[in-house]
Amino acid sequence: MPNSYIFSSESVGEGHPDKVCDTISDAVLDACLTQDKYSRVACETLVKSNVVVVAGEITTKAKFDYNEVIRAAIRGIGYTNNDDVFHADKVFIMNILTRQSPDISQGVDAKAAEGKKKAEQGAGDQGLMFGYACNETEELMPAPIMFAHRLGRELTKIRKADKLAKWLRPDAKSQVSVRYVDGKPVEITNVVISTQHAYDVKHSTIEEFCINQVIKKCLPPKMLTKDTEFLINPTGRFVVGGPEGDSGLTGRKIIVDSYGGMGRHGGGAFSGKDPSKVDRSAAYMGRYVAKNVVAAGLADRCEVQFAYAIGYPDPVSVHVDTFGTNTVSEESIIAAVTKVFNFKPAEIVKQLNLLRPIFSKTTNYGHFGKIDDLNSITWEKTDKAAALKKAAK
């Protein structure tokens, strides 16, 4: 008997309250890095109704108008309609950002462990980070999360073009359920789209549009069957959305940001954090390693885990799991990984070229699986696959 199960993943649109916060936090980070690549940034955002609160710790030489950066980020999302309670030009902004604690910076900037070179950068915090890859899609990502991202991205593309569906508004969510047989995705069983809309559009119009212009356009036709269920705005109405409808916080969509629940997550959010924070940089490195392992044909699925201690430059552990899909021994894969890659925070930053204002490109539709801008999203490259394959022999 074949092993059959259904796995679901969701994505959210740029106007979702939590994504609004991620967008603002990464916009502030990029503004800092544009002028000072060594900026230390931990920017958290809260939104509700017409209020934006930014809090956290920033140490930078950059000089810019925080309010304008925040308003520009909101404007880019699309909260500019006259009837928006949360409006780019009208929100009240509270800024309670302070400098990074000297107790943290001394461990990040210099040695923390005996015998380590003074120039070595320590990890910005303790914690564990995961990277994951599989051969289910061209992007070497799990199918459910990639399909959900495709739907969300297409909704936003159509909304911002402002031609085909002028009634679309920024807040949206998508969810895709995929049936697996013997570990392989074979069909889509259910698709859910909830999209904010103008008050005067009929539900039937929204339903027809989402099915014909979004779902059938974005998802593989061979995986949509006569039994695939489409649920469009299941409550029947979604006029009040965004921060008017719900509060938002930076870092509350970490599963959307990563692997849709198929690969594990260490718990640390990405947005608003500079690359000295291993929550972000080591998670990117984990993806880089796992993707190259799969691209090298060493395994069909690969998950990598790192763990760090604050101020200490070396990871305290490195773990690789291929879930029995490996084509060579796991010992060979682990040996190859540790030979080809360096997991010290400073080396991660150098290898992935992270001291640049690239992070706003990561905020929406997943930090992983974006292969159309490898100059910025460097952890999606597969340039180490050949070296891994050679080292694993």
Where are these regions (language model features)?
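Conserved phosphate/anionic-ligand binding catalytic regions in large, soluble enzymes, centered on
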Residues: 10-12, 16-21, 121-137, 239-264, ...
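Short beta-strand elements
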Residues: 45, 108, 127-134, 174-197, ...
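Internal helix-turn-beta structural module
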Residues: 48, 301, 309-393
